[in-house]
């Protein structure tokens, strides 16, 4: 594979995470405007975003098989057509049913693209380089989470309709579409070259279950928290711009944290530092919820930084529970994390309707505490120390 081809594929991976990050994170910023557009209460409007998350979950789950049937390049190009149709549906329809359908399609497209992006990184890079590349790729999710809420606040403050935010997100996919030209993708399925050594099946162990629960609770807690921060902040009397700045601050420090931890993690035992980070994240989230307005930006900045490496560390630890990294095991943990994404508004919507945004934030805090317990319990059963090689550190 040529170096320019590898660079193109790596950028497709980066942008695939940015696309999903933009779609998932911008929800909290535009939810109120979309609720006004359809003349619905915010809590019931949030349920329609479950279609976006369901699309992401279904596509990540199915793409494990779909990648072996439909070439990756074809999937990405077809995804661009679907993206254009979905954004057009948002722009030209006043039907809630069509809005939900468009959200589902956006979820499908971003889920397929993100699973292709993850696969490309694991194919292109080995050992320690793979781990740092995955962290760097994941940082594009956060980068989009920093940029697009600012774009949304800029557009909404100028009374520009909310659907133009999704048109801007569509530009990320346009870049992916352009990159597919003159680019060779790895072959899969029948066309792939199989290694001569047979793969020995290994038992996963209970540690994988702890990690799967941690992945689900972490993503559900994180998105449940960040999706309702704008509404919570507005309820405290903050302006839309200030509320948007809190979300952007979180993802900015999350992004810097990922870059920092891609160097820091190699000097520590992964399970131990993961437990410390999960505990700190739970404490910092509690301080944000109970703190004063003046301290909120500082707490959310430190929360973003210290929680940035948690999810990627969970996935990395999962891959180290077997001697030979199992794609199905990693996919299982990823799927559990994506279930957390799908459940975000299913869980938090009724809580907000009944008790307000602060109750949703406290629920998210409780989920972070569960992540800490799971990571602590993992220390007694994890196999990563016996399976990790010098190349992994």
From Swiss-Prot:
Entry annotated with the keyword Cell inner membrane: yes
Tell me the compartments it is located in.
Cell inner membrane
> What is the topology of this protein in the membrane according to its UniProt annotation?
Multi-pass membrane protein
* Domain of life of the native organism: Bacteria
Designated name of the protein: Protein TsgA
PROSITE patterns with a match to the protein in the record = MFS
Q: Enumerate the Periplasmic topological stretches.
A: 32-50, 99-100, 155-161, 227-244, 294-297, 353-360
Question: What keyword terms does UniProt attach to this protein?
Answer: Cell inner membrane, Cell membrane, Membrane, Transmembrane, Transmembrane helix
Decide whether keyword Transport is in the record. no
Name the NCBIfam families for this protein.
PRK03699.1
Q: Which residues lie on this side of the membrane: Cytoplasmic?
A: 1-10, 72-77, 122-133, 183-205, 266-272, 319-331, 382-393
As one GO molecular function, the record gives: transmembrane transporter activity
This entry carries the following GO cellular component terms, namely: plasma membrane
Q: Which family does it belong to?
A: Belongs to the major facilitator superfamily. TsgA family.
Instruction: Name its species.
Output: Salmonella typhi
Q: Which Pfam families match?
A: MFS_1
Q: What InterPro entries has UniProt attached to this entry?
A: MFS (IPR011701), MFS_dom (IPR020846), MFS_trans_sf (IPR036259), MFS_TsgA (IPR023528), MFS_TsgA-like (IPR050375)
């Amino acid at each position: 594979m040529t170096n320019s081809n590898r660079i193109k594929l790596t950028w497709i991976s980066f942008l695939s995470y940015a696309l999903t990050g933009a779609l998932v994170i911008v929800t909290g910023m535009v939810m109120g405007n979309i609720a006004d557009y359809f003349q619905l209460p915010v809590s019931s409007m949030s349920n329609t975003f479950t279609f976006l998350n369901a699309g992401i979950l279904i596509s990540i789950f199915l793409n494990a098989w779909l990648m072996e049937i439909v070439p990756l390049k074809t999937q990405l190009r077809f995804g661009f057509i679907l993206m254009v149709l979905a954004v057009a549906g948002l722009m030209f329809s006043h039907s809630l049913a069509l809005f939900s359908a468009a959200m589902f399609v956006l979820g499908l497209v971003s889920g397929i693209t993100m699973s292709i992006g993850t696969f490309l990184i694991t194919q292109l890079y080995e050992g320690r380089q793979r781990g740092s590349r995955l962290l760097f790729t994941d940082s594009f999710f956060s980068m989009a989470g920093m940029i697009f809420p600012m774009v949304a606040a800029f557009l909404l403050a100028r009374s520009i309709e909310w659907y133009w935010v999704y048109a801007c997100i569509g530009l990320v996919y346009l870049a992916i579409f352009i990159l597919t030209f003159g680019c060779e993708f790895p072959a899969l399925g029948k066309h792939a070259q199989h290694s001569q050594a047979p793969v020995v099946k290994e038992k996963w162990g209970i540690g994988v279950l702890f990690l799967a629960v941690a992945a689900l609770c972490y993503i559900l807690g994180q998105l449940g928290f960040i999706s309702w921060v704008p509404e919570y902040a507005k309820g405290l009397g903050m302006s839309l711009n200030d509320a948007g700045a809190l979300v952007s601050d979180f993802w900015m420090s999350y992004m810097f944290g990922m870059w920092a931890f891609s160097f820091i993690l190699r000097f520590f035992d992964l399970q131990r530092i993961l437990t410390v980070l999960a505990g700190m994240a739970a404490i910092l989230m509690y301080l944000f919820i109970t703190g004063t307005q003046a301290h909120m930006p500082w707490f959310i900045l430190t929360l973003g930084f210290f929680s940035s490496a948690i999810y990627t560390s969970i996935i990395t630890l999962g891959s180290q529970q077997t001697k030979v990294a199992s794609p199905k095991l990693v996919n299982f943990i990823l799927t559990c994390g994506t279930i957390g994404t799908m459940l975000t508004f299913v869980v938090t919507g009724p809580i907000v309707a009944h008790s307000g945004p602060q109750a949703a934030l406290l629920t998210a805090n409780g989920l972070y505490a569960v992540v800490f317990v799971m990571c602590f319990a993992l220390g007694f059963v994890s196999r990563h120390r016996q399976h990790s090689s010098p190349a992994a550190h």
